[in-house]
A protein has these predicted regions:
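Hydrophobic residues on the short alpha-helix immediately C-terminal to a glycine-rich phosphate/catalytic loop
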Residues: 42-46, 66, 177
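A short helix-turn-beta junction within AAA+ P-loop NTPase domains corresponding to the substrate/partner-engaging
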Residues: 174-187
Length: 205
């Protein structure tokens, strides 16, 4: 699978179109266009191609904001999935509430992790992960069960990762984020550390 790391709106769209069989990572660094807008353009492209099995995973506090912006700026319908709406869907007879017809599913990290099997079975075509730095500890395995559950549930799904702070404390955070997209890009943790620690040392010299 191809992996594109992009920094602006043009690169984002070009990469999204060129890597139809690949996976996409996005860090919205443009000073003029917000990450929600950039992601919205990718979502709109998928929607126009009738690829509508889409999920957005975001902090709980941002779910309504995502829903409003999708409707107001891109005319895209969405469905916020939480404990209450999940139960209501089940009562209506929907065996997997993550499967919504012509609606983008919006849910929280915690809820996606809790229902990771249902997320996987929904077979999403695209996932947008907002504030993706929350998954940067994925490389720690059992120490980050939420990150692992989400990454595993979306293992066959194309991903757009949105974050303004991909790196805070360690280069391993970059390793963790990229591994969410594809476990094989950097190899294992040891090879990553060997390759990039030597690069940092060489640069410093």
């Amino acid at each position: 699978d191809a992996l594109g790391v992009v920094d602006n709106i043009g690169d984002l769209l070009n990469t999204a179109m060129k890597t139809k069989l690949g996976k996409l990572a996005a860090s919205a660094m443009s000073p003029y266009v917000g990450k929600t807008i950039e992601a919205g353009l990718v979502l709109t492209q998928y929607w126009s191609e009738r690829k509508r099995k889409i999920i957005i995973i975001a902090p709980s506090s941002l779910r309504k904001q995502w829903s409003m912006e999708l409707k107001e700026k891109f005319f895209l319908d969405s469905f916020i999935l939480d404990g209450k709406s999940y139960k209501e869907e089940r009562i209506r007879g929907n065996k997997n509430p993550f499967e919504q017809k012509d609606k983008i599913v919006i849910t929280s990290y915690q809820f996606a992790s809790k229902h990771s099997e249902a997320v996987f079975l929904a077979a999403f075509q695209l996932s947008v992960i907002d504030e993706a730095h929350k998954l940067r500890n994925y490389h720690r395995g059992e120490k980050s069960k939420m990150s692992f559950a989400i990454a595993n549930a979306l293992r066959d799904t194309k991903k757009v990762l949105l974050t303004a702070t991909p790196l805070q404390n360690s280069l391993l955070e970059i390793f963790g984020l990229v591994s969410v997209i594809d476990d094989f890009v950097f190899g294992d943790k040891k090879s990553f550390q060997k390759q990039f620690s030597s690069t940092v040392l060489t640069t410093s010299d």
